[in-house]
Design a protein with these regions (language model features):
Chain B
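Catalytic Walker B motif of ABC-type/P-loop ATPase nucleotide-binding domains
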Residues: 151-155, 160
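ABC transporter nucleotide-binding domain
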Residues: 169-256
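C-terminal coupling/interaction segments
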Residues: 248-298
Length: 228, 298
């Protein structure tokens, strides 16, 4: 049997971590918001950021999943390459399903006039201008971007252990401090936010090459990772 | 005979310490190998390198004629059951077996079901909630039912009771007879397995001490017991691995094939020749050298 499929099977047995937990959490948060909307009779518009939870969860999920399944898969004599491909395929699949669901819920929200109680949960106001297909794409890109960002970090941990994590975060903090200092020094913060405000759509596009870089880095790191 | 594992000057270093040093051996197809030694001797490290889970610092390593690293032609023929294996938190016994069934190409469903019954494992129980012995049973089931051409067991029965252990030996021998393959077994319970082993590798402090057919080894290890002077003169110039004396009596353990002449001479001098068990032999060989010296001074 194809071993990449074997890796996906390992992940599929863990549907809870991959699919159910994030959706249960988010739908629960949605239900709370909906109840509040009903109680206030929709007099006040609610702009919930609750949909962010599923994106943050994607980042966290791979940290959990990799810590548990990488040693297991290697213990079954699965190649690191197959683990990487199978895990990435699983992430793409889960992201695709979640994006379609988010998109569908957004459409329902639109047609029910914000659930009849001015609750803006799935249909985000700043994406109003984007075509439906574009919206679906953005849901998907942001999600896999979050996933592979987590994948790189968990792979650094896998490859270089606790020391590697330590060095990585120190470097990250130093680097962002320098950047932030430089921005303040040259008085660039306002320009920066103005630029973001005008170009946030480009940020989504930039996530595509970033995601590819994360994926390549994860692969290179995992190729040299060991288990004991 | 077909050599399925060839290891040449294999070394694994952690900083300045060498966990495995200059180890060279070969494994032939269709035999049961025992990889014996004390805790921390380097057995597990060697097994991890054979299965490409760890990388050697230097030396050559070939499994089925190829480098096992990222090589599915090699890895798909292996099954490595280790005591330290971890499982995903949400997994039940059932999940582990289902996954194993889809990954090992030669998986025998019937055998797995039968073993599951023999070891009385609760299918629906989470791996996290299993006792040490049950965890070992899961490993044993995978190791046997995977029918991998090279199956490696590292301390496979930690926490298993005597009944379960003898069940393991029985099933292993039965299945080995029906489906010959190569098995490598590392264990502390040497006496229990010594009759099954066909070839013995002894590792001590990262080095290979012994690489011999079990039969030869058994015929070579003797303790000579008798009056001090007679024992000393008889064993002079022979390969002595242990000696002890109490009063005027002395016992010396030899690792050397004795010819019939030697045996007759020993009998004539009133010396007793006692074959020693493999476990005793390995204890003598791997006891730290300083202890040996203290014994000599006494």
């Amino acid at each position: 049997m194809n071993r990449t499929a074997g890796v996906m099977k390992i992940h599929w047995r863990d549907k809870w971590v991959w699919m159910y937990v994030p959706w249960v959490v988010m739908l629960f948060s949605f239900a709370v918001n909906l109840v509040i909307g009903i109680l206030t009779r929709g007099e006040e518009p609610i702009n919930s950021g609750g949909v962010v939870t599923i994106y943050v969860y994607m980042f966290v999920a791979i940290l959990i999943v990799q810590a548990q399944t990488f040693p297991f898969a290697l213990g079954l004599n699965i190649r690191r390459t197959d683990y990487f491909v199978g895990t990435s395929a699983m992430a793409l699949l889960v992201s695709a399903v979640s994006s379609v669901l988010l998109f569908a819920l957004g459409m329902i929200e639109q047609f029910t006039n914000a659930w009849g109680v001015q609750l803006h949960y799935f249909h985000l106001p700043f994406l109003k201008e984007v075509s439906p297909l574009g919206r679906l794409g953005i849901y998907f890109i942001v999600m896999i971007h979050m996933f592979f960002m987590g994948f790189v970090i968990s792979s650094i941990h896998r490859r270089f252990g606790r020391t590697g994590m330590f060095v990585f975060f120190i470097a990250l903090i130093v680097l962002s401090s320098i950047c932030s200092f430089a921005m303040t020094y040259y008085g660039l913060w306002l320009d920066f936010f103005r630029w973001i405000g005008a170009h946030y759509m480009d940020l989504f596009l930039w996530m595509i090459p970033l995601t590819v870089i994360y994926a390549l880095l994860s692969y290179v790191l995992l190729r040299r990772a060991t288990v004991s | 005979m077909n050599r399925i594992v060839e290891v040449n000057r294999l070394t694994k270093e952690y900083g300045r310490d060498a966990a495995v040093k200059d180890v060279t051996f070969a494994v032939e197809e269709g035999k049961i190998y025992g990889l014996l030694g004390r805790n921390g001797a380097g057995k597990t490290t060697i097994m991890h390198m054979l299965t490409a889970q760890l990388f050697p610092s230097s030396g050559e390593l070939k499994v089925f004629g190829e480098n096992p690293y990222e090589n599915n032609r090699v890895l798909s023929q292996l099954c490595f059951i280790k005591e330290s294996q971890r499982y995903p938190d949400s997994y039940r016994v059932l999940d582990v077996l289902k996954v194993a069934a889809s990954i090992y190409p030669n998986w025998d469903r019937d055998l797995a079901a039968q073993l599951l019954e023999d070891f009385r494992l609760p299918l629906k129980r989470r791996m996290k909630k299993l006792s040490r012995g049950m965890l070992s049973s899961v490993g044993i089931i995978i190791g046997l039912a995977s029918r991998a051409p090279l199956t490696i067991f590292d301390e496979p029965y930690l926490g298993l009771d005597a009944v379960a252990r003898s069940l393991f030996y029985e099933r292993l021998m039965q299945d080995y007879a029906e489906n010959p393959r190569t098995i490598m077994l590392s264990t502390h319970l040497i006496d229990e397995v010594s009759n099954m082993l066909e070839h013995v590798l002894v590792i001590d402090q990262g080095r290979l001490l012994i690489d011999e057919e079990a039969e030869d080894l058994r015929g070579k290890a003797y303790t000579v017991l008798g009056p001090r002077a007679a024992v000393e003169s008889f064993t002079a110039g022979k390969n002595t691995i242990h000696q002890e004396s109490i009063g005027g009596m002395m016992s010396v353990t030899l690792l050397e094939r004795l010819d019939p002449g030697d045996k007759r001479r020993a009998e004539a001098q009133g010396l007793e020749m006692i074959p020693i068990s493999m476990q005793q032999l390995i204890v003598h060989l791997t006891q730290s050298k300083s202890n040996g010296k203290v014994a000599e001074f006494q």
